[in-house]
Amino acid sequence: MSRYRGPRFKKIRRLGALPGLTSKRPRAGSDPRNQELSGNKSQYRIRLEEKQKLRFHYGLTERQLLKYVRIAGKAKGPTGQVLLQLLEMRLDNILFRLGMASTIPQARQLVNHRHILVNGRIVDIPSYRCKPRDIITAKDDQKSKAMIQNSLESPPHEEVPKHLTFHPFQYKGLVNQIIDSEWVGLKINELLVVEYYSRQTKT
């Protein structure tokens, strides 16, 4: 299944706020979690919607998300928490959380078009896994810095999470540590996502 490129507001009306996909928010009272009680939904649908929220927020294909679930399942620690850490430490997401891009798709474009350096070297792979002490900067040219400046000046501005530090005048971000679960940028029940994929990960 390919990455979603359809109407974004349609998705947030159904799934709730997806800040990685769009800065728009559903109107008050339009959040489906307020409209429907969980008891009116099947357990499969509840798990499916949590999985879809994760996929659309981080801009992943179905195959990519399943791959991350399988990696998380083999790692030490709770699978759901490891999954969120893997997704949050992607370069495209780090750029978004720093405020250097307004959305994750925009961050992915910055990386694909070679505007971003990690530790002084151009990285053009959005899924690049950042690690503590990584230094993320804009390429030293006017176009790269102008694109990031536009994002910095575009509301809304989310608080930079504690595992990151951003120096706006230098267009530079630092990864201080692996993200803690309380700083994940999406309201999600990751356990439901793991349960959704439980059959696929056993095959």
UniProtKB/Swiss-Prot annotation:
Q: Which organism is it from?
A: Oenothera elata subsp. hookeri (Hooker's evening primrose)
Indicate the quaternary assembly. Answer: Part of the 30S ribosomal subunit. Contacts protein S5. The interaction surface between S4 and S5 is involved in control of translational fidelity.
Q: Which PANTHER family match?
A: 30S 40S RIBOSOMAL PROTEIN (PTHR11831), SMALL RIBOSOMAL SUBUNIT PROTEIN US4M (PTHR11831:SF4)
Q: Which HAMAP family match?
A: Ribosomal_uS4_B
Give residue ranges for domain S4 RNA-binding.
89-150
**Lineage of origin:** Eukaryota, Viridiplantae, Streptophyta, Embryophyta, Tracheophyta
Describe the family membership recorded for this protein in Swiss-Prot or TrEMBL: Belongs to the universal ribosomal protein uS4 family.
Gene name as annotated: rps4
Q: Where is this region: Disordered?
A: 15-42
Pfam families per UniProt? Ribosomal_S4, S4
What are the protein's UniProt keywords? Chloroplast, Plastid, Ribonucleoprotein, Ribosomal protein, RNA-binding, rRNA-binding
* Source organism, top-level taxon: Eukaryota
What protein does this entry describe?
Small ribosomal subunit protein uS4c
